[in-house]
A protein has these predicted regions:
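N-terminal secretory-pathway/extracellular module detecting exported/lumenal segments
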Residues: 22-82, 88-147
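N-terminal signal peptide c-region/cleavage motif recognized by signal peptidases
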Residues: 18-20
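Repetitive helical segments and hydrophobic/amphipathic motifs
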Residues: 11-14
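Bacterial N-terminal signal peptides that target proteins for export
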Residues: 1-9
């Protein structure tokens, strides 16, 4: 009977520890990695968001801005954005799939605006070396899943 109680206690302890351990693992995967910093902004990549889409990659990027950025909505500004970008590593270019902007830094506060683009309407931008876009592309392409 004593060994049965011990097994019950172990089973309960494992059941209670399981969700906490899983939450810690998930939190670690959702951390933002700082990839590029200038006087005006800092850009981060969520490493767990990097996925292959055909021969390209897609990743979520957070950008914090030093000064309020003008929004497409009249009279509104934002200090941070979360953008899903498509990366073409071979041609050193990237395109915005979705963007959401926020009043505060670190994606905090009221959402200001959002926009999306379909795969057939992507607007590709060059990502030259030593630029924020270039640093983002280099990081994402170096983290290629399965590669």
């Amino acid at each position: 009977m004593n060994s049965m109680n011990t097994l019950s206690v172990i089973a309960i302890a494992l059941a209670l520890a399981g969700p906490g351990a899983l939450a810690q693992e998930t939190a670690a995967l959702d951390k933002w990695q700082s990839v590029a910093k200038t006087d005006n902004q800092e850009a981060f990549v969520n490493g767990s968001s990097i996925v292959a889409v055909g021969e390209q990659l897609e990743a979520r990027v957070k950008q914090n801005f030093a000064l309020p950025q003008p929004s497409a909505k009249k009279g509104k500004t934002y200090l941070s954005s979360r953008t899903t970008y498509r990366f073409d590593c071979a041609q050193r270019r990237m395109a915005m799939k979705e963007v959401r902007t926020y009043v505060g830094i670190d994606l905090q506060g009221e959402p200001v605006q959002k926009a999306t683009s379909s795969d057939k309407n992507l607007q590709w931008l060059d990502a030259p070396d030593s630029t924020v876009f270039g640093e983002l592309l280099d990081y994402v392409c170096s983290q290629s899943p399965g590669g």
